[in-house]
């Protein structure tokens, strides 16, 4: 039996009815149009239930049975081993996590439910006048493994818009933050405060069947995703603008509303950039700090709000979420020194000076990838179309041509190719979003999609609390000595 939760207390009956009519209209009117606009859609289309929650209710028993059978047949199979170096080295490469939404291939890059980024760009629905996938469509794919129809995506947009209003006390909490408090700290603070209205926490306190966990988790995850947009917008407008935040528009998509609350919706290219940005940054396997943290905290049955707040705190760390700022600072410094001279000789000279001083080239290399990051390629293609003559993009483009050869000759990197962070800062700067300290908030809004999709499945599959075994150095020495 499906559980239908009551509308949020802040939503008036009139607004709720209006939103339901909008979603119903979108579902009924857009089915044929989606096939006309997207001829590449194949049998992988989600063609059964039009509601994401209803579709999940159909898929979950199938997945549960699949995993039960798989574990019965292969539960004792060994898939890897752990070395002492891995234990001291951040558990890099240790095969120990379940993450359904994406898998990172060293050569092809990220695959979202089996689809590469170029495939997602071709298959996932876009806005009527746009080319980039709508992040809503990627979320549907991450959750179900299926390509949604345009009508399903538009209904999801309407649902998120309807859930987006913040409780008054959360707005006041953000407004009372000192301007010296980092935007990521404000973001985490506001998301934590949403725990006040957690459907999962309230249902758990009342007592609920464990088979119903996912239904309440789903409601919280949808509220979480919807509310990250006005939270981020309020933080940005308070810190860098006049404090006035545009209202969410019920008939617009997630990315448009995000651009709108930031104050950039009058530029359609920026809206398209946000669609691209939110899509390609949404998920990147489960072992990175933000993804793993969300999964770990959620395994204790903390609500999605508490889990995502912890995830954001991990993302705020300079080793995880600040890479694109470091790249941008590198590019700005380099541009000041070499000016408009983008000759191979000048750029190589600058790079060798950098490397010989013991520093690295920011934005190049990756812990897993061994080819150019397809997320970089997607941003490069966007820049080639919309800002080919921008001086900073031209510098990025020349580095793309020259750096791999220099790093290969240098011989100290396994991957001399650019990663996702090598490009995003230049794009944001071009369109006027110049406040670098806010860039990680953009990352967090996007990463919420990936973390939330897995949290739903964590509860649906009944995954237990995470509890790996730890050892002291002395205990490890004794283990080695007894061999």
UniProtKB/Swiss-Prot annotation:
The active site is at residues 320, 366, 421. One of its GO terms (molecular function) is citrate (Si)-synthase activity. One of its GO terms (biological process) is citrate metabolic process. Its EC number is 2.3.3.16. GO terms for cellular component: mitochondrial matrix; mitochondrion. It is found in: Mitochondrion matrix. Residues 1-16 form a transit peptide. It comes from the Eukaryota. Its main location: mitochondrion. This is Probable citrate synthase, mitochondrial. The lineage of its organism: Eukaryota, Fungi, Dikarya, Ascomycota, Taphrinomycotina. The gene is cit1.
């Amino acid at each position: 039996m499906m559980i239908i939760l009551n509308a949020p207390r802040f939503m008036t009956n009139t607004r709720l009815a209006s939103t339901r009519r909008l979603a119903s209209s979108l579902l009924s009117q857009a089915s044929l149009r989606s096939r006309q606009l997207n001829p590449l859609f194949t049998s992988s289309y989600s063609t059964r239930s039009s509601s994401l929650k209803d579709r999940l209710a159909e898929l979950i028993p199938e997945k549960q049975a699949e995993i039960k059978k798989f574990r019965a047949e292969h539960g004792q199979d060994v898939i890897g081993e752990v070395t002492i170096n891995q234990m001291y080295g951040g558990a890099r490469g240790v095969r120990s996590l379940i993450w359904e939404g994406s898998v990172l291939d060293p050569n092809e890059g990220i695959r979202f439910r089996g689809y590469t980024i170029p495939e997602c760009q071709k298959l996932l629905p876009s806005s009527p006048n746009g080319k980039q996938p709508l992040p809503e469509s990627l979320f549907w794919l991450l959750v179900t493994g299926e390509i949604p129809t345009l009508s399903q995506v538009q209904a999801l947009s309407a649902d998120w818009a309807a859930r987006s209003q913040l409780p008054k006390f959360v707005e006041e909490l953000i407004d009372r933050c000192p301007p010296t408090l980092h935007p990521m700290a404000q973001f985490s603070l506001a998301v934590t405060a949403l725990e006040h209205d957690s459907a999962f926490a309230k249902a758990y306190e009342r007592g609920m069947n464990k088979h119903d966990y996912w239904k309440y988790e789903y409601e919280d995850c949808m509220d979480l995703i919807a509310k990250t947009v006005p939270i981020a917008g309020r933080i940005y407008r308070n810190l860098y603008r006049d404090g006035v935040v545009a209202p969410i528009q019920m008939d617009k998509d997630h990315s448009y509303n995000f651009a709108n609350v930031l104050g950039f919706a009058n530029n359609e290219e920026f809206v398209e950039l946000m669609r691209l940005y939110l899509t390609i940054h949404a998920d990147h396997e489960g072992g990175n700090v933000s993804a793993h943290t969300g999964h770990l905290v959620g395994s204790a049955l903390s609500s999605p709000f508490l889990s995502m707040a912890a995830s954001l705190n991990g993302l705020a760390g300079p080793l995880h979420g600040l890479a694109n700022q470091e790249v941008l600072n590198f590019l700005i410094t380099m541009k000041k020194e070499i000016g408009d001279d983008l000759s191979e000789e000048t750029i190589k000279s600058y790079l060798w000076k950098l490397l010989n001083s013991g520093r690295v080239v920011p934005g190049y290399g990756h812990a897993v990838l061994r080819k150019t990051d397809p997320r970089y390629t997607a941003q490069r293609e966007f820049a080639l179309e919309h800002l080919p003559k921008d001086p900073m993009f031209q510098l990025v483009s020349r580095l793309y041509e020259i750096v791999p050869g220099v790093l290969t000759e240098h011989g100290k990197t396994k991957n001399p190719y650019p990663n996702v962070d090598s490009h995003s800062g230049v794009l944001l700067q071009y369109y006027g979003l110049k406040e670098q300290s806010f860039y990680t908030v953009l990352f967090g809004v996007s990463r919420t999609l990936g973390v939330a999709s897995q949290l739903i499945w964590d509860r649906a599959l009944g995954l237990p609390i995470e509890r790996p075994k730890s050892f002291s150095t002395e205990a490890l020495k004794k283990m080695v000595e007894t061999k």
